[in-house]
A protein has these predicted regions:
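Extracytoplasmic "Venus flytrap"/periplasmic binding protein-like
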Residues: 57-125, 160-162, 257, 261-265
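Hinge/lid segment of periplasmic solute-binding proteins
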Residues: 98-148, 175, 202, 288-290, ...
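C-terminal lobe and pocket-closing loops
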Residues: 270-284, 295-391, 419-421
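Glycine-centered hinge/linker elements that transmit conformational signals in sensory
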Residues: 178-179, 217-247
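A structural signal for short loop-to-beta-strand junctions that line the ligand-binding cleft
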Residues: 91-92, 121-157, 187-188, 299-302, ...
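Short, low-complexity disordered leader/linker segments with a strong preference
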Residues: 1-38, 60, 414-421
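Extracytoplasmic/periplasmic solute-binding protein
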Residues: 140-144, 149, 173-220, 226, ...
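Short, solvent-exposed loop/beta-turn-alpha elements that line the ligand-binding surface or hinge
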Residues: 114-125, 167, 189, 208-229, ...
Length: 421
């Protein structure tokens, strides 16, 4: 995914901004010397330009702290972080996927940051980042940035059909408009049968969940009335196009399908629009974005919030410097800059206006205010590895009895989530 880079700002101005919002003395210096805070950030989470600007500004504002950032690859990062937390040479700050925090916290390898929430404006954090950053009642992950799915649509096809996306305030209005678009060789929507993150949003809209916990034991919840209603809506929407019922958005890549020119809309992160244009330059300027509509007017659809949290290993050599680093990077000034630079959703709802001029990011921000995460337990990783949710969706879309298939999938989820208990 390609992102727009942040325009350069002088180090002097940056340092002044940092000084104005800095956390003050952190006690991290080593006997009057300079402390080096070791940081692991993930590939492409920030641009090289942003990383340089932040590092220079931070070090100018905090002359007793040097920043050493190591870029990590997503492939295999779970095992690498687990190994680092178990050793004696862990970095001071680690960027972790928001849904990964629970498994690292369960191991006892993370520092409990609960007493720093107020200092870090925790009351305003996006729920989809803050909730998975907590485990067993304690806050381990500090929300860093978010991204979620929106509707990417063809402006010209919507206009030709007389559909105004601004008027699609409910799911039923969305269905009616998509039905109108689904004619004359145009797919109203390309929705593959196994886009389970989208299904999760519809389930949450109905008041349901993928799984629930009681007395320390997790239970699959796809067979509840609420979850079944979410699946029923997914089936209605999926039928208004030619998306395959037995695969997800990667097989075939849905951006490439949309680039062929016969698809009116897809559910994707805004970055998917860049891939569409790369595959068909004639569509440049013809793509727009709107939040996934909700069940009722005035409330956008629930979405799965992807993104990252920042954590501090329990074995970190410089925890005070680590917290100073985190406070700056997750504070107002740098969150606004990061959001503009990378088309992200900032970590707090009050900062959403920072991306008002970015159509894709602003559509994400509307949805992110109603964001959720997958069940906050290490056991969910086993569910995703098998992914009975995908099999359930295909079974229903190909004629299976929804209640029976949901019961089977829920049993599989229950088994997977409790396998290690």
């Amino acid at each position: 995914m390609k992102y727009r880079l942040l325009a350069g700002v002088s180090a002097l101005v940056t340092a002044a901004a940092l000084s104005a919002c800095s956390s003050g003395g952190d006690g991290a210096g080593e006997a009057g010397g300079v402390t080096t805070v070791d940081v692991w950030l993930m590939r492409d989470s920030v641009s090289a330009a942003f990383q340089k600007e932040f590092t220079e500004g931070f070090e100018a504002a905090h002359p007793d702290i040097d920043v050493k950032i190591q870029i990590q690859e997503w492939d295999g990062i779970g095992q690498k972080i687990t190994a680092a937390l178990a050793g004696n040479d862990a970095p001071d700050v680690i960027e972790a996927g928001n849904t990964q925090v629970a498994q690292f916290a369960e191991s006892g390898g993370l520092l409990d940051l609960s007493d720093r929430k107020d200092e870090l404006d925790g009351g305003d954090w996006l729920k989809g980042l803050a909730e998975p950053g907590a485990y067993d009642g304690k806050q381990y992950g500090i929300p860093y940035y978010a991204a979620n799915r929106v509707v990417v649509y063809r402006k010209d096809l919507f206009e030709k059909a007389g559909v105004d996306p601004a008027e699609l305030t409910t799911r039923e209005e969305w269905i009616a408009a998509t039905t109108k678009l689904n004619r004359g060789g145009t797919q109203g929507i390309y929705l593959p049968g196994q886009l389970w993150y989208a299904l999760a949003g519809f389930v949450w809209d109905e008041g349901g969940d993928l799984a629930t916990e009681s007395g320390g034991r997790w239970k699959g919840a796809l067979d509840t009335p609420e979850a079944l209603r979410g699946m029923a809506f997914y089936a209605r929407l999926q039928a208004l196009g030619k998306g395959p019922r037995d695969s997800d958005e990667d097989d075939p890549p849905q951006a490439e399908v949309m680039a062929q020119g016969q698809v009116a809309q897809v559910i994707s992160t805004p970055g998917g629009a860049n891939v569409v244009v790369e595959n068909n330059p004639e569509l440049k300027g013809k793509l727009g974005f709107f939040p996934i509509p909700g069940k009722t007017a005035g409330t956008p659809g629930a979405v799965f919030t992807g993104g990252s949290d920042l954590v501090v290993p329990a074995a970190a050599g410089h925890p005070d410097a680590a917290l100073t680093f985190i406070k700056e990077l997750t504070g107002d000034a740098w969150q606004k800059k990061l959001a503009v630079a990378m088309s992200y959703v900032p970590n707090r709802t009050s900062l959403a206006p920072a991306v008002a001029e970015d159509p894709g990011a602003s559509a994400m921000a509307v949805g992110a205010a109603h964001g959720h995460a997958t069940p906050n337990t290490p056991g969910w990783a086993a569910v995703e590895a098998e992914n009975p949710v995908k099999d359930y969706m295909t079974a229903v879309l190909t004629g299976g009895d929804a209640e029976q298939e949901a019961a089977k999938a829920s049993a599989d989820i229950t088994r997977a989530m409790n396998a290690g208990s």
